[in-house]
């Protein structure tokens, strides 16, 4: 706005007169007010004010002038002084006012205009001034802001300078540090180099050390083998000497026995009849004893020793280590000590060999205590003589146990760990040395009993009485009573022992121990005639109270029972070892289902009669010390633990090792509970060592009143001891309370049931005893019997309506107790009776908890699966093991199947007071089997938490954690599919569409990422496993996820993945977890589909055929690049399959690019003509007429089986147009109808051919240069490893994804089939019959059946008879019958072979069969011999071959390389054995191949010419010899001889297969010209190409070959280079090349090209001849 105003502002700086001109000029002149400064604005303002004043003055002047003009105008109008004025007046007055205009400008109007303009300008100036003032204010404010910003800028600039200074400092420091670090890096690099150098040195040293170590290991293994051999010889010799010694000892003993007999007879005659009765008994028993001593060191002795020396000792640590620590020493057995020391172990060293050196006894370990034993009275020695069986007269001396293996008081563990001196005499009781010399078959217990009862009659006890026993609670004896009892016992034992002269093997006692024995207040255990006056003696009628909670304490001896014969039954099991597992310390006899069962407990008592003299029982009392559990405890069928009241623990648990023995005569055994070791029990042991209380003898003999406690007590004792006779006598008395309970509440029925006396239980139940009478802890007889496992007692009690669900005070039911102790027969009976499984104890435990807590799988299975019969309580006797067996079997076969559990889920998940379920217990204790059974129950809740919020997984061991993690895991097979394979499609009959590679475990917590990784990893592992070299498991192989396998397959080869029927891709996620997804969709398998030809890929072809992907892609590139490709190789090399798959891949690629494509197949046979081929080309639009424009369609033509026709005849006319495909180079072809026309091949035509022939020959070689050839060699990839990979994949599929171990029979069978294929081809190549070579196709059908190697051998025999043998036969005949005309180069097999040819064929088949096929067969020799007859030609005698022609080898030949006939040793004039070529070679040029095998650095051109001349002359002489009727099989026979003469069978596969071996079979040593220099292996050898060794070939090479010759190879080239340019080398070069390990590769690698080269050269040189 200011500028607008200024632009119109006039300049009034002029004089007022010029004001009018100024207005005109003002428009032109403009001012820009905005550009003026303050001073200029002020000046302008003052000028304007001056102008305004000037205007005012002008206005006033103008007003004055106007006045004058007005007056003049008004009044001077008519003045005649001025004529002009008069004219003006007249003018104005003449016309109207409106029409007239003034003659001059009116000054007033001008003034008014000027004034109006001034007003406008004034207004404008005022607005401009106001704007200028506002701008001025704004400018002032901006200046203030600018100043502030300048100050801030200064501050920031200063701060920037400071920061720059700091940064400069930091940069300098960093530069300095960089320099330091770079110097450090250089130093570190130097150090690293030094360290690496040191590391290399160390590695070299380490490798050297490893080699030395391996050598040392080898040496040490050889030494060990030698030592083992010597040791075995020494062992044999020792056994022989020992047997001899035994015989001598037996003979000596017999002689001594005869001497003793004679002496005693003489003494008897002298003494007369008076002394005869007193001597007869000792003599009789002594004679028996000596007879038993005679063969004391033979085999069964070790069994008896093991019975006695191996009890598990748990109560005292120092006794634990005793049994095997000290060998028996002969010094312990001097006759004096043995006769006097009752505590001695081996008391008759003169007659007894001192024990067994491998078995140490308890008594051997107490030598320190022996000298302290005072000698006994002399009458003992007189009576017994040198008694081998005399033991210390301890309170528990050896009882008569005629049928058991050792004295039953093997309770040496019962010694409390108070002091060793107390325990040691106790050990002396049970030394095996006392029995070591006894009769080997006669039970050592019987021997011990015999000697005991003969020898201890007069031993004084501590009171001076000649009694065997210590003072017992009811003993106030007189000598007469003691003598009566002992005499009765002695008579009984004598009668019993007279029945046991035959050898007996007995089950050992199971030693028991009470760990709570209170020993400190008692005198030493071993009372060897020492007076112990501190022992309290109790009157006969006042028995001490039975210790609480210890039922069944024996307080009376049992009455006599005559069934001692039963002891001999079933020659008891010799399983006398001691199991050390807290449950059974001695193994039960094999004839019993239960270790604690009483043998014949039902039958024995029925025939007992009290009229017989009483027999000694096994009531063996213990010293008042109470430290050792008596024999009663040994025979006790079960004992309660001392710590816990009632039945909370099994009899065999850790706290109670009073283990029941196998008792042979039930009624004469008095069980005693473990409480006999408790305090206060010292005088409660009743019976003397003979088993009879003297005060009880009159009662039993006369029927008078027993001087014991009351009848109820006696009733309980009889029931506890199983004394059926006494029990029946007592039950017949009137007024007897059969339900009387002792202070523990134990009734007679309870004691009998607890100890397993079935007959006593039956008697008491028939007498109407209370069946459910409970003790003070609430346990009934059924509880006791179930806890102890006495299932017959349980059966009886259930039959008498015992309460099967009775719960004790702690809530334990009989079923709970049976489960707690693992008594499965009792569990089964209780369940069949309808016992409730869900009753809980006070702690909240059910029977399931109890079964799981002990880890008893059978108990748990019964609880979960055993159904109660429909008819209720079943008491029928069944096989006790049958249901368990069926259960196991069904459980294994179908864990979730038809065998469903009968317990509800609530019971399985029942928690105790701590919140622990059965699964918690099983998992925490590591009972994996129990946890597995629980997991099979569908209702198990593994996630249930205890009161500490822990699941079963939280408390589980590692094994159980793994089980729980996989509890609900889905095992889904992962399969690889290659799509549909058309049946019979070009050799793909043996290919499989799908292969199972593994099973994926999908858990509940598995995420999709984990699942995707698992699938990818499984695929990668599988591809690498099938392409690896050896049988390595997936765990052993270090797989790399990033790299593809050696066959080129990897995760990128996958086209799609389907989960069941739902498509899925790696990395894809669904809303559900994989576990839920699989369950919901019921996905039974995961299928991975590989990319195939339909997608333009070859991955599925690679996986199907096991040809590496890189090679297939290379073949495809060759076809696309060269358009004309022929695949050739031995028959069965999958040529047709490869060509067809490549064609399919190309077709789909072209179609994807928008082209139409067609595949045309033509199978060529002998009648296929060139005209037919022309028609084929024309009809398929490959050949296009010249006038016609080319088509855009792509055509792929496959010509199969070209070997059946002549290549030159069939394809000869097409070679030029195929190479030059354009209309400019047409060719005239004649159609099948006879018309001819010009055609050309267009660019979009691809031609593939297949030839099932190892090499070309003759005129067919002309075709070679016009095609690109792909050679499929049997000894080179892809064929070499194809069979191995294919069979490995087959095995992996058969084992459902697992790779079996290398020692698995399946692996050995597959390796054998693979070796057969390789060895066959190796031998056939060596025999010079390449047309018989086989590709791997025939071996792809090898059956893989685990456990049936015979099937593979049968398959091999069929393959041999149908394919291999006919081909070999034809090839051998064709080679042995070459046409007589030279130069034709064709072989024709004779239709009627001569006898010599037939013999050669048979020999060749037999040698091939033995060397290549049967060698290495995994079947045993016997089975293999049965299958040998199935192979054709296997019966030919090889001796005929070896004797066909004498062919000696030279000394220079190494053993590893059987180089027979590998070098030319004959001149042409003395060519005695002809050289045979392959059938596809002419006779010419063959010698040259063997002579000029290597490129020697000598005149190549000269040598070339000479070699051909040599060659032709040799061949001519050969043909002349044929025409003379030579033996044309000699050559083959010599080669066969060389194959036979190889020492090692496997040498066939190692024999070098070089070209000379294919064709040279002359005998060595016949060529003096060449044999002069045989030993110069260092001839310079030039190589054009070195063929690499494949891994298989390298392993096949012999170790004895020369290492320096590994690189020797021949020229390998696809170009037609004449082989004759190679110089003929001297003999030494020939030798070195023949021993090179590359010979094996070279035969097949180069045979075809070289043959072609030969042919071309021959054809060039033939006209020159």
Curated annotation (Swiss-Prot):
Gene Ontology BP terms: regulation of synapse organization
UniProt-annotated stretches for the region Disordered: 1-23, 201-235, 360-441, 455-480, 499-617, 1447-1484, 1544-1648
Positions annotated as ANK repeat: 710-740, 744-773, 777-806, 810-839, 843-872, 914-944
Sections of the chain in a coiled coil: 120-276
Annotated compartments: Cytoplasm, Cell cortex; Cell projection, Dendritic spine
GO cellular component, one term: FAR/SIN/STRIPAK complex
Biased composition (Basic and acidic residues): 1544-1562
Modified residues (Phosphoserine): 1526
Its job: Regulates the dendritic spine distribution of CTTN/cortactin in hippocampal neurons, and thus controls dendritic spinogenesis and dendritic spine maintenance. Associates with the striatin-interacting phosphatase and kinase (STRIPAK) core complex to regulate dendritic spine distribution of the STRIPAK complex in hippocampal neurons.
Protein name: Cortactin-binding protein 2
Natural source organism: Equus caballus (Horse)
């Amino acid at each position: 706005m200011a500028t607008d105003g200024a632009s119109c502002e006039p300049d009034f700086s002029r004089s007022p007169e010029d004001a009018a001109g100024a207005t005109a000029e003002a428009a032109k002149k403009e001012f820009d007010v905005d550009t003026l400064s303050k001073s200029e604005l002020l000046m302008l303002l003052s000028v304007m004010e001056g102008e305004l004043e000037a205007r005012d003055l002008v206005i006033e002047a103008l007003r004055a002038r106007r006045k004058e003009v007005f007056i003049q105008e008004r009044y001077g109008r008519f003045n005649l002084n001025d004529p002009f004025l008069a004219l003006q007046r007249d003018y104005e007055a003449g016309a109207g006012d409106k029409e007239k205009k003034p003659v001059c400008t009116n000054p007033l109007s001008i003034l008014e205009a000027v004034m109006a303009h001034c007003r406008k300008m004034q207004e404008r100036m005022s607005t401009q001034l106001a704007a200028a003032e506002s701008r001025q204010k704004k400018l002032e404010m901006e200046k203030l802001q600018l100043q502030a910003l300048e100050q801030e800028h200064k501050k920031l600039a200063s701060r920037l300078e400071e920061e720059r200074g700091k940064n400069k400092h930091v940069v300098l420091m960093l530069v300095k540090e960089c320099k330091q670090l770079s110097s450090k890096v250089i130093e570190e690099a130097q150090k690293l180099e030094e360290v690496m150098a040191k590391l290399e040195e160390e590695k070299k040293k380490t490798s050297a050390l490893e080699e030395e170590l391996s050598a040392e290991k080898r040496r040490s293994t050889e030494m060990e083998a030698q030592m083992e051999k010597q040791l075995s010889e020494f062992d044999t010799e020792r056994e022989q000497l020992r047997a001899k010694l035994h015989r001598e000892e037996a003979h000596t003993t017999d002689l001594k026995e005869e001497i003793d007999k004679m002496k005693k007879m003489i003494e008897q005659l002298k003494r007369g009849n008076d002394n005869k009765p007193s001597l007869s008994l000792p003599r009789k028993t002594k004679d028996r004893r000596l007879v038993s001593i005679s063969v004391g060191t033979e085999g069964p002795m070790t069994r008896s020793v093991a019975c006695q020396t191996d009890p598990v000792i748990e109560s005292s640590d120092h006794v634990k280590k005793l049994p095997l620590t000290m060998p028996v020493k002969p010094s312990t057995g001097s006759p004096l000590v043995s006769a006097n020391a009752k505590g001695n172990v081996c008391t008759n060293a003169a007659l007894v060999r001192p024990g067994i050196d491998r078995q140490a006894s308890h008594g051997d370990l107490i030598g320190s205590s022996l000298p302290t034993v005072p000698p006994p009275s002399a009458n003992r020695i007189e009576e017994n003589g040198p008694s081998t069986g005399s033991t210390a007269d301890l309170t528990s001396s050896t009882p008569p146990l005629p049928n058991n293996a050792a004295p039953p008081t093997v309770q040496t563990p019962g010694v409390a760990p108070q002091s060793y001196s107390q325990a040691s005499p106790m050990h002396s009781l049970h030394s095996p040395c006392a029995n070591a010399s006894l009769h080997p078959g006669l039970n050592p217990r019987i021997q011990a009993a015999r000697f005991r009862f003969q020898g201890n009659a007069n031993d004084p006890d501590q009171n001076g009485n000649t009694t065997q026993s210590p003072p017992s609670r009811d003993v106030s004896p007189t000598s007469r009573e003691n003598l009566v009892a002992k005499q009765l016992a002695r008579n009984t034992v004598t009668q019993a022992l007279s029945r046991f002269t035959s050898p007996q093997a007995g089950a050992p006692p199971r030693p028991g121990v009470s760990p709570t024995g209170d020993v400190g207040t008692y005198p030493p255990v071993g009372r060897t005639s020492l007076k112990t006056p501190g022992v309290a003696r109790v009157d006969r009628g006042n028995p001490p109270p039975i210790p609480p909670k210890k039922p069944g304490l024996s307080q009376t001896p049992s009455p006599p029972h005559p069934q001692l014969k039963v002891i001999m039954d079933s020659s008891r099991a010799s399983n006398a070892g001691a199991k050390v597992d807290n449950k059974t310390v001695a193994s039960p006899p094999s004839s019993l289902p239960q270790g604690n069962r009483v043998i014949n407990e039902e039958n024995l008592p029925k025939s007992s009669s009290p009229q017989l003299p009483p027999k000694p029982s096994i009531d063996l009392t213990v010293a008042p010390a109470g430290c050792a559990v008596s024999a009663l405890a040994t025979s006790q069928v079960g004992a309660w633990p001392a710590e816990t009241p009632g039945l909370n623990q099994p009899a065999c648990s850790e706290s109670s090792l009073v283990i029941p023995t196998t008792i042979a005569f039930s009624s004469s055994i008095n069980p005693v509970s473990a409480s006999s070791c408790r305090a206060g029990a010292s005088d409660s042991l009743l019976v003397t060592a003979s088993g009879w209380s003297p005060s009880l003898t009159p009662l039993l003999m006369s029927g008078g009143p027993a001087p014991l406690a009351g009848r109820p007590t006696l009733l309980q004792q009889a029931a506890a001891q199983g004394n059926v006779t006494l029990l029946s006598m007592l039950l017949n008395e009137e007024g007897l309370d059969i339900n009387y309970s002792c202070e523990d509440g134990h009734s007679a029925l309870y004691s009998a049931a607890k100890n397993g006396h079935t007959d006593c239980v039956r008697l008491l139940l028939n007498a109407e005893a209370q069946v459910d009478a409970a003790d003070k802890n609430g346990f009934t007889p059924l509880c006791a019997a179930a806890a102890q496992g006495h299932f017959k007692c349980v059966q009886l009690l259930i039959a008498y309506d015992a309460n099967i669900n009775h719960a004790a005070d702690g809530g334990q039911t009989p079923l709970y107790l049976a489960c707690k102790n693992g008594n499965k027969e009792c569990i089964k009976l209780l369940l069949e009776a309808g016992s409730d499984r869900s009753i809980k104890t006070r702690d909240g435990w059910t029977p399931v908890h109890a079964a799981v807590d002990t880890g008893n799988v059978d108990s748990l299975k019964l609880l979960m699966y055993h159904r109660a019969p429909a008819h209720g309580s079943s008491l029928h006797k069944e096989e006790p093991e049958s249901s368990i067996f069926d259960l196991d079997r069904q459980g294994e076969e179908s864990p979730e199947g038809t065998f469903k559990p009968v317990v509800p889920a609530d019971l399985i998940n029942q928690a105790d007071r701590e919140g622990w379920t059965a699964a918690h217990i099983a998992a925490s204790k590591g009972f994996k089997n129990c946890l597995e059974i629980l997991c099979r129950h569908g209702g198990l809740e593994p996630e249930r938490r205890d009161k500490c919020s822990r699941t079963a997984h939280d408390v589980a061991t590692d094994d159980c954690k793994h089980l729980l993690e996989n509890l609900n895991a889905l095992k889904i097979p992962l399969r690889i599919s290659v799509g549909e394979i058309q049946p019979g499609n070009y050799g793909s009959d043996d290919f499989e569409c799908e292969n199972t590679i593994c099973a994926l475990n999908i858990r509940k917590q598995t995420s999709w990422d984990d699942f995707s990784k698992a699938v990818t990893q499984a695929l990668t592992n599988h591809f690498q496993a099938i392409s690896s070299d050896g049988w390595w498991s997936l765990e052993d192989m270090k797989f790399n996820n990033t790299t593809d396998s050696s066959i080129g397959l990897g995760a990128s080869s996958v086209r799609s993945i389907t989960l069941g029927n739902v498509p899925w891709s790696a990395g894809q996620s669904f809303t559900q977890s994989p576990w839920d997804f699989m369950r919901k969709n019921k996905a039974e398998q995961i299928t991975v589909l590989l990319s195939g030809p339909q997608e333009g890929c070859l991955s599925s072809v690679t996986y199907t055929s096991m040809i590496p992907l890189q090679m297939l892609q290379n073949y495809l590139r060759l076809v696309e690049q060269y358009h004309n490709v022929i695949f050739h190789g031995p028959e069965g090399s999958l040529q047709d399959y490869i060509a067809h798959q490549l064609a399919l891949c190309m077709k789909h690629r072209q179609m994807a690019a928008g082209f139409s494509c067609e595949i045309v197949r033509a199978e060529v046979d002998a009648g296929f003509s060139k005209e037919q081929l022309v028609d084929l080309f024309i009809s398929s639009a490959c050949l296009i007429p010249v006038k016609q424009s080319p088509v855009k369609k792509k055509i792929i033509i496959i010509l199969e089986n070209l070997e059946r026709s002549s290549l030159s005849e069939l394809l000869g006319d097409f070679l030029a147009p195929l190479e030059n495909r354009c209309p400019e180079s047409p060719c005239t072809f004649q159609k099948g109808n006879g018309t001819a026309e010009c055609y050309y091949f267009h660019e979009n035509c691809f031609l593939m051919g297949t030839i099932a022939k190892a090499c070309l020959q003759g005129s067919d070689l002309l075709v070679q240069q016009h095609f690109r050839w792909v050679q499929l060699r049997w000894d080179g990839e892809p064929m070499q490893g194809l069979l191995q990979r294919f069979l490995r994949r087959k095995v992996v599929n058969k084992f459902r994804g697992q790779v079996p171990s290398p020692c698995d029979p399946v692996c050995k069978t597959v390796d054998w089939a693979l070796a057969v294929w390789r060895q066959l081809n190796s031998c056939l190549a060596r025999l010079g019959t390449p047309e018989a070579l086989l590709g791997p196709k025939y071996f792809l059908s090898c059956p893989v059946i685990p456990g049936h190697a015979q099937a593979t051998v049968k398959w091999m025999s069929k393959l041999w008879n149908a394919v291999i043998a006919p081909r070999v036969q034809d090839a051998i005949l064709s080679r042995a019958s070459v046409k007589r005309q030279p130069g034709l180069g064709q072989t024709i097999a004779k239709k009627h072979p001569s006898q010599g040819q037939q013999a050669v064929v048979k020999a060749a088949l037999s040698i091939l069969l033995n060397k290549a096929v049967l060698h290495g067969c995994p079947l045993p020799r016997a089975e293999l011999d049965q299958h040998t007859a199935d192979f054709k030609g296997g019966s030919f005698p090889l001796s005929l071959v070896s004797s066909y022609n004498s062919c000696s080898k030279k000394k220079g030949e190494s053993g590893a390389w059987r180089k027979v006939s590998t070098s030319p040793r004959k001149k042409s004039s003395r060519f005695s054995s002809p050289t045979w070529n392959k059938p596809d070679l002419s006779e010419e040029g063959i010698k040259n191949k063997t002579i000029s095998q290597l490129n020697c650095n000598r005149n190549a051109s000269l040598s070339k010419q000479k070699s051909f001349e040599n060659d032709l002359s040799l061949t001519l002489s050969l043909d002349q010899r044929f025409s003379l009727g030579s033996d044309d099989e000699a050559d083959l026979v010599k080669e066969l001889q060389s194959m036979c003469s190889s020492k090692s069978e496997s040498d066939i596969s190692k024999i070098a297969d070089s070209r000379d071996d294919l064709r040279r079979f002359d005998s060595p040593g016949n060529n003096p010209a060449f044999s002069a220099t045989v030993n110069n292996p260092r001839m310079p050898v030039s190589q054009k190409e070195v063929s690499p060794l494949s891994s298989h070939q390298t392993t096949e090479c012999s170790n004895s070959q020369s290492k320096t010759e590994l690189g020797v190879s021949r020229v390998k080239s696809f170009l037609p280079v004449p082989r004759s340019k190679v110089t003929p080398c001297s003999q030494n070069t020939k030798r070195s090349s023949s021993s090179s390990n590359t010979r094996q590769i070279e035969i097949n690698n180069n045979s075809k090209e070289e043959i072609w080269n030969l042919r071309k050269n021959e054809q060039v040189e033939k006209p020159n001849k």
